[in-house]
Amino acid sequence: MELTLWTYEGPPHIGAMRIATSMKKLHYVLHAPQGDTYADLLFTMIERRGSRPPVTYTTFQARDLGGDTAELVKGHIKEAVDRFKPETLLVGESCTAELIQDQPGSLAKGMGFDIPIVSLELPAYSKKENWGGSETFYQIVRTLLKDHSNESKHTWQEEKRRPRVNLLGPTLLGFRCRDDVLEIQKLLGQYGIDVNVVAPLGASPADILRIPNADVNVCLYPEIAESTCIWLERNLNIPFTTTVPLGVGATQDFLKELHKVLEMEIPQSVNESNNSKLTWYSNSVDSNYLTGKRVFIFGDGTHALAAARIANEELGFKVVGLGTYSREMARKVRPAAKALGLEALITNDYLEVEDAIKETSPELVLGTQMERHSAKRLGIPCAVISTPMHVQDVPARYSPQMGWEGANVIFDDWVHPLMMGLEEHLIGMFKHDFEFVDGHQSHLGHLGGKGTQNTNKEAIKTNLQDSVITDSDPIWTHEGEKELSKIPFFVRGKVRRNTENYARQAGCREINEETLYDAKAHYKA
């Protein structure tokens, strides 16, 4: 067992809950103790939904364990069916209830309901949230379509209609899924392609039954939909796309792949460079400032891989770290990291990720909510590219990540922290100039002239300093700290560590301005 303050993924029943809450006319009975009802907050607080998840908890307590908990489960299942009247019922158990082995799915199937019942067996102690979501979606599709005929159907050309596709994978608590769906629907409409079903987000069991009416499945989020797409291809002969349209290059490749699978002629407009402002900026003089910037990437497999491609091929960044917390995606991330001359970081320990960030000294971190906190402590700009996320990453406005507009949003989210970082560095460099001195006359007239107290001087220095100082650690003098503060904040941590290592080797007890430049010469030699 591992005790941690933060975790990238919850247990698999949270993934099942995401699928159930994303869909309509479906209910989830979860055999769980009273403490596991916290999951409701994920949707009401972070997603800011106006309704509770369609989940009924058995909420057994310690005193119930001495009796027949199976009867408790059956009672809650009957109440849920009578009250909510779902078209499909999901039945599962949380990590705690798994130990009791009541097998609620089998109990539900023996109660004689005339609706499809999906029994979820999610190994809570070996799998996590994304796997649970993927398995739940797979079981729903397989249960509802198991009797569907596998006979070959007519193509869209034979039926003389526009081609149809399914968009599979978007869920609640996914990263910008709502807006991605709208953007991809708009994008496909421009090329004469209709969307048949979007699932699981917004889909009902009746919509799942319409999945075979499509010509192609678009796998938008492999963590959730890949296993389902493979089953649909194998059993219903529906091919699926493998390119995720994140970034300009990937969007072009996605459109080419989709046109090829649909046997459509690829239009020239797919390759036009004016579809996104990201391409224009990358070709502009202004982008020279960002060329070669060191970037560290960590997130779910889909977004981490896409971020690495965008950073390396479209923005000219240097990727110094690449990793994922999703072990199911590790097989795809490792070769991508190797192609960049890196070793992939596969871990679910946020402290290990923070140590990797310190070691690589990037100028920009692209990660999750946890990397945002780590980067803030280290004084490094950060943009969130993946779940887990907090409420500020679920904007009320339209803010996709996929397609042409998604590339624009990514461009803004990644470039702005670096540009603001340059401004911060310039202010830090010239803060001793007379125009920045506290008490100088302000352009605001009567509101100016009052000195402002700097309440966060440590932020100017750096917060990469070890919290525990031993007798062997050299001490920074005031002159040394002052000179260190003139170094750009995004490399200041690395300079501090190198200087301290040099001072230890040279036997210096104090680090002054001269020691700092001696260390610089030593490491350049």
From Swiss-Prot:
Active site residues of this protein: D286
Highest taxon listed in the record's lineage: Bacteria
Swiss-Prot/TrEMBL keywords: 4Fe-4S, ATP-binding, Chlorophyll biosynthesis, Iron, Iron-sulfur, Metal-binding, Nucleotide-binding, Oxidoreductase, Photosynthesis
Transmembrane feature ranges: none
Cofactor dependence: [4Fe-4S] cluster
Residues annotated to bind substrate: G421, L422
Biological process according to GO: light-independent chlorophyll biosynthetic process; photosynthesis, dark reaction
UniProt EC number: 1.3.7.7
Record's cofactor remark: Binds 1 [4Fe-4S] cluster per heterodimer. The cluster is bound at the heterodimer interface by residues from both subunits.
Example of a GO MF term: ATP binding
SUPFAM superfamilies linked to this entry: Helical backbone' metal receptor
Pathway as given in its UniProt record: Porphyrin-containing compound metabolism; chlorophyll biosynthesis (light-independent)
Residues that bind [4Fe-4S] cluster: D36
Catalytic activity, as annotated: chlorophyllide a + oxidized 2[4Fe-4S]-[ferredoxin] + 2 ADP + 2 phosphate = protochlorophyllide a + reduced 2[4Fe-4S]-[ferredoxin] + 2 ATP + 2 H2O
Function: Component of the dark-operative protochlorophyllide reductase (DPOR) that uses Mg-ATP and reduced ferredoxin to reduce ring D of protochlorophyllide (Pchlide) to form chlorophyllide a (Chlide). This reaction is light-independent. The NB-protein (ChlN-ChlB) is the catalytic component of the complex.
NCBIfam families per the UniProt record, alphabetical: DPOR_BchB (TIGR01278), PRK02910.1-4 (NF002790)
Assigned protein family: Belongs to the ChlB/BchB/BchZ family.
The protein's assembly and partners: Protochlorophyllide reductase is composed of three subunits; ChlL, ChlN and ChlB. Forms a heterotetramer of two ChlB and two ChlN subunits.
The protein, known as: Light-independent protochlorophyllide reductase subunit B
Taxonomic lineage from the root: Bacteria, Bacillati, Cyanobacteriota, Cyanophyceae, Synechococcales
Gene: chlB
